Structure formats: C-alpha cells, structure tokens
C-alpha cells in the first residue's frame, strides 16, 4: 500500500502544471516585449527584410488594411509603398504589456503620417500584438492594426 501511495504522489507531481516561479514574468520581460515590437517597425521603416524576419515568428500573421497577411506579404506591402514614393512615419506610443512565461500581449497608439510628398497627412492607428518567447528571445507572432479616421471638423 505504501508503494502505491508513493507512486500515486510521484505521478501527481509529474502531471501537475508548472508553478509560476518556474517561469517568472518581470519588468525586464515587459521591456524586451516593447523592444521586440519596436524592432519590427524599425525594420519595416528601412525595408530591412533580415531584421524584420528576426523580429517576427516564421508563422507571423497581420491584420492590416482589412486583410489577413503573412509576414512576407506585410513586408512587401510596406516595401512597395516605399518604392512608389510613399512615406510612412510611425511614432509608437507607450505600450500596455501583459504576459507570462512564453507569451505576451502589447497594445499601443501609433500616431504618425503617411502619403506621397508633398501630400503627407496625419495618421493614427490603434495596434496590438501577440508575442512568443523562444530561445532567440521575444518575437512578434501577430499584429493587428486599425486605422483611426480623423475626427470630422466642425
């Protein structure tokens, strides 16, 4: 009977979910998530495909301009916009970041401008991202971007 009890306790210990102390979430993680999101936008701003791929997961997905896009599709959209003369200025505001061991979520306002010079107009986006931690660090797995229409003038 004693052996059965020991075996039962051993199985229960192995099958129990890991405690939060095994995988802490810290202010440093919040800062790393913030940097990972900003690194993705920095790569897009200068059409740096290598840096973009380092900043996102292989299965990255974006909801942008009312469409679902892969990482390659989003990169090409921005790169082609730049090649056509369009300027896109992003200014990512403070982020709200939440997370746990291997996943994180971030949300922010992005206030900037876009257009073909000299017709550059103010733009505002509300954005959020889901990130995954890997051995290489935090990577953006999903981006959702919604353009906010300018307020009508009275």
Go through each PLM region and give its residues.
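Sec-dependent N-terminal signal peptides
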Residues: 5-14
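Short, low-complexity N-terminal intrinsically disordered segments enriched in polar/charged residues
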Residues: 16-58, 102, 152-154
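Short beta-strand edge/turn micro-motifs at domain boundaries
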Residues: 21, 124-154
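Short beta-strand segments enriched in hydrophobic/aromatic residues
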Residues: 44, 56, 110-112, 144-147
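A solvent-exposed, acidic/Ser-Thr-rich amphipathic alpha-helical stretch
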Residues: 49-100, 119-121
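Short, surface-exposed coil-to-beta transition loops
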Residues: 89-92, 107-109, 122-128
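A short hydrophobic beta-strand element
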Residues: 101-112
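Beta-strand elements of well-folded, non-transmembrane domains
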Residues: 112-116, 131
């Amino acid at each position: 009977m004693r052996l059965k009890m020991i075996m039962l306790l051993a199985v229960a210990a192995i099958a129990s979910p890991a405690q939060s102390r095994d995988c802490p979430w810290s202010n440093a993680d919040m800062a790393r998530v913030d940097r990972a999101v900003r690194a993705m936008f920095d790569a897009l701003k200068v059409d740096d495909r290598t840096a973009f791929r380092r900043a996102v997961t292989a299965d990255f997905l974006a909801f942008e301009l009312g469409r679902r896009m892969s990482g390659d599709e989003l990169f090409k959209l921005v790169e082609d916009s730049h090649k056509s003369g369009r300027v896109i200025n992003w200014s990512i505001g403070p982020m709200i970041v939440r997370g746990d061991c291997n996943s994180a979520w971030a949300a922010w306002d992005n206030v900037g401008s876009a257009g073909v010079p000299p017709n550059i107009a103010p733009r505002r986006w509300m954005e959020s991202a889901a990130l995954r931690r890997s051995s290489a660090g935090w990577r953006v797995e999903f981006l959702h971007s919604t353009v906010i229409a300018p307020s009508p003038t009275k």
